[in-house]
Amino acid sequence: MGLLPLVKKLGFIIFLLVSASAFALCSAGRSSILIYSQEDDHPEVVERRIHEHERILRMNSRDYGHSSPKPKLVRPPFKLIPN
């Protein structure tokens, strides 16, 4: 009879541990992008990023080969079945 309250308390403690660890895992991640906001103010950094963006836009996409269509499957010629 005294075992039921102990099981309930133990279950509640396990539930709290699982939910706390789930919250810790969900909140983990990369740091905020606001950390890097001070670096963006320099004109040299802005100019370099503009130059890199222009270079990426001018990149030739034909450098990676050509896209040839897959060969179509042709039906084999009809073969007569001998009687």
Curated annotation (Swiss-Prot):
Disruption phenotype: Abnormal endodermal barrier formation in cif2-1. The double mutant cif1-1 cif2-1 is defective in ion homeostasis in the xylem due to defect in endodermal barrier formation in the roots. Highly sensitive to excess iron. Retarded growth under low-potassium conditions. Repeatedly interrupted, discontinuous Casparian strip due to patch-like localization of the CASPs proteins. Reduced rosette leaf size.
GO cellular component: Casparian strip
Region (Disordered): 61-83
Signal peptide segment: 1-28
Modification Sulfotyrosine occurs at: 64
Keyword Cell membrane: no
Keyword Signal among record annotations: yes
Function comment: Peptide hormone required for contiguous Casparian strip diffusion barrier formation in roots via the regulation of CASPs protein expression and distribution in a GSO1-GSO2 signaling pathway. The Casparian strip is required for ion homeostasis (e.g. iron and potassium ions).
Subunit text: Interacts with the specific receptor kinases GSO1 and GSO2.
Protein name stated in the entry: Protein CASPARIAN STRIP INTEGRITY FACTOR 2
